[in-house]
């Protein structure tokens, strides 16, 4: 089977809900990272076979957002593209699908990633609007909740699944708040030291009032304290432990990577950054969706012929502190190896982009620390997980 390599990896800075990127569509964010990934890879855009982009909140974006983004990036009309919706795993699944196509001999060069603007997600009228309301009130649905954050199986918020995990695995409020504080501190330190500079591409933001360049993550709370986190009320269950402070945010952003067949990359004189060793998904009960990374990671490690102890750095999406801690407890994560520059609790979670974002961040962290093996993994709403193992190439 053909080897797949990553030859470039970029992301936008992550915007807060209704923050700096609120006027920039997911398609424009996607176009920005697609163009930048190709430029960083130093490949001829004519050699791009396909573009695969994750995007969850597609309502109102128009046909096939990935195709729109690739055209806006300047790629030729002959380049095909498709959009992936695997909820929080969409961006990483896009990379896995790119690898599969290359391994199958269907392509040599694919741009893969994810894009999301949660700030611009619309509201929907219920189905009665199609046939007429006649009598009574209608209902308006929030696309963020309906298509992104509500469990379609059980009809409750993802936060309740985190409460379920906390109860099932004995994860206390204090443990969750401590993890959240560590995430905030690591992210603040990473921003201060410029650790994200190499992976972030600037976004030119144009509004009616001003034009500016957005290039730094704005969601982290650098001044967060244990006292402030402890004072927050539970967000989903009055007697619960999950709060706005120990959960990820609602955010905007995009990320993209150029994936190539290894021999083709070398023949073109390129220097691959990493080899994709394995990828896998796993299913769990929807009520405990946060545990999805456990079977996914176990499968990915088995396919790579590795043990968790072999992994040098891990990026595990912090959808909620409760699920992150339970996953780490179950798999036996070494806390010194995980989310070394902070995670989604601090940086944010633009759901369709996060899978690609954590892979981009993982790769750059491995480069900065001269590490060889990395693992990226996320839980997925509906009761799934996804994981990928990469090997950095010198």
Swiss-Prot record:
Keywords: Acyltransferase, Cytoplasm, Fatty acid metabolism, Lipid metabolism, Transferase. Its main location: cytoplasm. It comes from the Bacteria. One of its GO terms (cellular component) is cytoplasm. Pfam families: Thiolase_C, Thiolase_N. It is found in: Cytoplasm. The keyword Hydrolase does not apply. GO terms for molecular function: acetyl-CoA C-acetyltransferase activity; identical protein binding. InterPro entries: Thiolase, Thiolase-like, Thiolase_acyl_enz_int_AS, Thiolase_AS, Thiolase_C, Thiolase_CS, Thiolase_N. It catalyses: 2 acetyl-CoA = acetoacetyl-CoA + CoA. The active site is at residues 88, 349, 379. Its EC number is 2.3.1.9. It is an enzyme of class 2 (transferase). One of its GO terms (biological process) is acetoacetic acid catabolic process. Pathway: Metabolic intermediate biosynthesis; (R)-mevalonate biosynthesis; (R)-mevalonate from acetyl-CoA: step 1/3. PANTHER family: ACETYL-COA ACETYLTRANSFERASE, ACETYL-COA C-ACYLTRANSFERASE. Belongs to the thiolase-like superfamily. Thiolase family. This is Acetyl-CoA acetyltransferase. The gene is atoB.
């Amino acid at each position: 089977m053909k080897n797949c390599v990553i030859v470039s990896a970029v992301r936008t800075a992550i915007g807060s809900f209704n923050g700096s990127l609120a006027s920039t569509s997911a398609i424009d964010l996607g176009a920005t990272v697609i163009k930048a990934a190709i430029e960083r890879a130093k490949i001829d855009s004519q050699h791009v076979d396909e573009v695969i982009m994750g995007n969850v909140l597609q309502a109102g974006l128009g046909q096939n957002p990935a195709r729109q983004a690739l055209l806006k990036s300047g790629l030729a009309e002959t380049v095909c593209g498709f959009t992936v919706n695997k909820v929080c795993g969409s961006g990483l699944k896009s990379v896995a699908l790119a690898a599969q196509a290359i391994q199958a001999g269907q392509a040599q060069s694919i741009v893969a990633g994810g894009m999301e603007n949660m700030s611009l997600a619309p509201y929907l009228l219920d189905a009665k609007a199609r046939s007429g309301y006649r009598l009574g009130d209608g209902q308006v649905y929030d696309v963020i909740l309906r298509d992104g954050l509500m469990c379609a199986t059980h009809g409750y918020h993802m936060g309740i699944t985190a409460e379920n995990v906390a109860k099932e695995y004995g994860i206390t409020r204090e443990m969750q708040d401590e993890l959240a504080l560590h995430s905030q501190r690591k992210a603040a330190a990473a921003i201060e030291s410029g650790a994200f500079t190499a992976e972030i591409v600037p976004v030119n933001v144009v509004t009616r009032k001003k034009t500016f360049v957005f290039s730094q993550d704005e969601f982290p709370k650098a001044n967060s304290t244990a006292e402030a986190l402890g004072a927050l009320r539970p967000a989903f269950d009055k007697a619960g432990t999950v709060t706005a402070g120990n959960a990820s945010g609602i955010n905007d952003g995009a990320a993209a990577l150029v994936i190539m067949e290894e021999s083709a990359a070398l023949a073109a004189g390129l220097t691959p950054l990493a080899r994709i060793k394995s990828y896998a998904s796993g299913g769990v009960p929807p009520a405990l969706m946060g545990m999805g990374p456990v079977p996914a990671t176990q499968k990915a490690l088995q396919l790579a012929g590795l043990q968790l102890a072999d992994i040098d750095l891990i990026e595990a999406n912090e959808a909620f502190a409760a699920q992150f801690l339970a996953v780490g407890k179950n798999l036996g994560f070494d806390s010194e190896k995980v989310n070394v520059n902070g995670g989604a609790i601090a940086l944010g979670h633009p759901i369709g982009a996060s899978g690609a974002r954590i892979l981009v961040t993982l790769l750059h962290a491995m480069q900065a620390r001269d590490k060889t093996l990395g693992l990226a993994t996320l839980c997925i709403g509906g009761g799934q997980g996804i994981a990928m193992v990469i090997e950095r190439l010198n």
